Amino acid sequence: MSDSKFTGEVSRTASDTLAKKSTAGDVISGGHLVAKALKNEGVDTIFTLCGGHIIDIYDGCLDEGIRIIDVRHEQTAAHAADGYARQTGRLGCVVTTAGPGCTNAITGVATAFRSESPILHIGGQSSLTQHRMGSLQDLPHVDMMTPITKFASGVFSTERVADMISMAARECFSGAYGPSYLEIPRDVLDAEVPAARAVIPKPGSYRASVKSIGDPADIEKPADILVKAER
């Protein structure tokens, strides 16, 4: 399927699946907050396998111009995000649906953890009203991801979606690089909130300007000062 045709199909699917949305500019959905926050963190591509729990995120990514690469297996998506992060030095992003979508990505996330690769894994979950009640593909994702990530948490309010993505991205680049995981329930993604209550942190202001292992350009600066010193 061509990129343009895929984009159109995702857009129509998202529109058909979501509850009727307000067109007012003073409200924003959780899915669009995810996309805006990812864009602020420099993400221009997400790797995923399409799933119903995360369809709202695709809708936001299409509006924000973030490329959606839809693969055949979530392990592939996780490895692709890892490879993207290693080659670009930027935050890689893998988005999976609940249950087997998350578990299929575990090997790729574990590889990123041992390789100190900065990737953000966003996973879907059933609605909060159905959490841990045996709903479709409901599993303890955060518990499973905690040992192989630097940061793993659920997001339980739409207002905090962007804030939590910023926090997770910060952990990816703090100290030794590595992956973070966020679980976002379907109703949190689908809900609309006043835009004023959903603050999106400024991008990148929390990050160090040098690599944790020593940026060659910054090491050369004091070396040059020492060489030119008279005493």
Residue map of PLM features:
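N-terminal alpha/beta PP-like core and its mobile active-site loop of ThDP/TPP-dependent enzymes
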Residues: S2-R231
